[in-house]
Amino acid sequence: MRFGVGMYSAQRPPGSPFTHRELYDDMLRQARLAEDVSLDSFWIAEHHFAGDGYAAAVIPVCAAVLGATHRLIAGTSVAIASFYNPLRLAEDAIALDLLSGGRFVLGLGTAYRPEEFAGMGIEPETDEARLDEVVDILERAFTGEPFSYRGRFYGIPQVTVTPPPFTDGGPPIMLAGDGVADRDALRAGARGKRYMVDPSLPLDEVTRLVALYDRAYKGREQLDLPLFNYGFVSDDADPWAEMREGFTYLRQTYDRWGGRPVRDVRRENHRLVLGDRQAVVREVLAYHHQFGDRLHFILRVNYPGQDPSRSDRAVELWGDVASMVRREIGRSA
């Protein structure tokens, strides 16, 4: 079982006292801290043209995280595939794979904001098909062999993407479930990729989608299951109070971007993993009981506008939780 932290979005809500320079410094500091407390991975999200400066350049941010650490995995959660030149994306991913010795995961997904499609010059109805073609091209590019490609959106004459990657078959690709949920799960499974379930979904829906993914994936070597979760760990304050303001801002921002009515954010309406260390250990063990050793449990403990000293402490406590869960799993093995 693995443990990660994220997603980091570097948002600056109205009235925030923290500059974007400070927010990016905070990301790198927390990446080093995550490694120090023996967490396994660190994840960065992507959006574009957001008034709060939501992180847009995930590839260079991952490069900075990988350069600041020695063991930590860094991944995109997710890069919007249709906004990238697929050959250049392949070259960038291979460079990160080489520089880090295999510690980069390329998470890919689709978009939904009209402003992003308009700004990038992409027709929304082509987004999912473009994702499929980008993955086709990446798979070929990562072989280090000559290939050509003729798709609906991308045409590539015979090329060889060099140098070849450090990781056999190229850096791992994770596909996100942000579109039509069943189709997303089936795509990831049929293509033999890791699957990222939308962290806002309730557990029964997560369980159903993972089962759907497993059926489509059947017959291949088992991959880890990256399960992203919202929550917080605190031993000296109410964890919901610690995350409520920033989480509310985040969820209501997503409502606005998705063209939905802006909803009240109540603790009981969300799948949250929060509490003191012992409470979070119990919750994580329940997830492990359900999904097994392949579980890669990723917890978001940083929220827009939050005092970074509080999320620093939450990362430390999350590292404690990870160590406690590992010991408990070891005892019961």
Regions found by a protein language model. Name each.
Residues 1-18, 113, 155-171, 258-268, ...:
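N-terminal small/glycine-rich loop or linker at the start of catalytic domains
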Residues 7, 36, 125-161, 204-296, ...:
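An alpha-helical appendage that flanks or caps ligand/catalytic pockets
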Residues 11-24, 79-87, 169-180, 269-277:
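Active-site mouth loops of central-metabolism enzymes
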Residues 82, 88-191, 204-211:
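Internal, glycine-rich beta/alpha segment that forms the wall or movable "lid"
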Residues 38, 46, 65, 96, ...:
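Conserved, mostly hydrophobic/aromatic
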Residues 3-7, 42-44, 74-76, 104-108, ...:
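Hydrophobic faces of well-ordered beta-strands that scaffold small-molecule active sites
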Residues 41-62, 80, 199-201, 299-310:
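Glycine-rich, proline-tolerant flexible connector loops at the mouths of alpha/beta enzymes
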Residues 1-68, 73, 169-171:
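N-terminal beta1-alpha1-beta2 module of alpha/beta enzyme domains
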